[in-house]
């Protein structure tokens, strides 16, 4: 669920994985691991993603269908 939501939000905003990785200060591969759900972000990164997309962490994690 988390990876799907990240991918959907990124595509809606028309942002590349490279741009997001740079924003987060991580490698592109590190970001790709989030979208493929091979790795989970730490709380700092999760909060940065929620802020970037203007959604709640609960939405990102699939705990809620409400974005804000």
Report residues per predicted region.
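Recognition helix of helix-turn-helix/homeodomain-like DNA-binding domains
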Residues: 25-40
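Short, basic-rich loop-to-helix N-cap that marks the start of a DNA-contacting helix
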Residues: 38-48, 67
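Short, charged recognition helix plus adjacent turn
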Residues: 12, 33, 51, 61-68
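Conserved hydrophobic/aromatic packing and binding residues within compact polymer-binding modules
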Residues: 6, 20-21, 31-34, 60
